[in-house]
């Protein structure tokens, strides 16, 4: 039987590989696998907004309804006129197109068939997209680019799609040992005690009449949880400080939790005080802490509900990613590219962060 050759730019191949790329990126993307929930009511660290996947536009707005503060009307007192006006704070995220592609090489150096080039291109681009998304989310959630040398975005990067990278406000920044950036010392490392200290700050903050949005935990099977994502060094420091017995308790707590089947537990290190512990190599790092500006530090993220907003648009094909193939140099070179319309930002209401506490500790670079 003769073999069917699917030509460059074939509509069926384009649709197939566009869909395959979307599936692969979702599987490989760290934040997607664990911490993203769909819709405005999602109980997850990041809410995925879908309004612009089918409609035109570049901006999605979303509201936070503040807690009521009125005193109750007692007995036969007249209630009329005492009703409290609902108070809303609004945030928004812009979307824009991002693109990337691969060059299959010239005819004399290209040893692969078009089908194989598509497969290799899909594999490399899915890795690239997932890495780009993960690094971008860490940057936005941390409010800083940091010194991480192996990122796709350079250290001078200031954000995309009109979504500003905003530093943590003072209410949502915890520095180990009760210090500030300029007074951190090398011994102010990550520990379970620092988790307690940060959690106290989270629970005491917001609500009431102060106009500060209260950081809400993630609700799973009736249990309330937060998530802490640490750098590899911070996780190592925490294990060392906890000791063998203490760390075993942390692991047991996660294994016996009611919500242990939830995605936020997948790949976790354990749980302490209802905080699910994770580590990742893309956590933002710094090198200028301490009085001498020479202490290495890392910014772990203590995450509550809806700490970030991710929005997608559609390229007009009904698929999340657009896949494009073309020949250049008189047909000598095969180019395969992909694009995605999206935007991301840390949620902020009334000028304050909402669902994330930055936890900065000393963290020596792992050589």
Segments and roles (model prediction):
Residues 52, 65-71, 98-100, 105-107, ...:
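Generic structural motif
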Residues 50-51, 215-218:
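A generic local secondary-structure boundary/capping motif
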Residues 50, 106, 112, 116, ...:
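Solvent-exposed, flexible loop/coil residues
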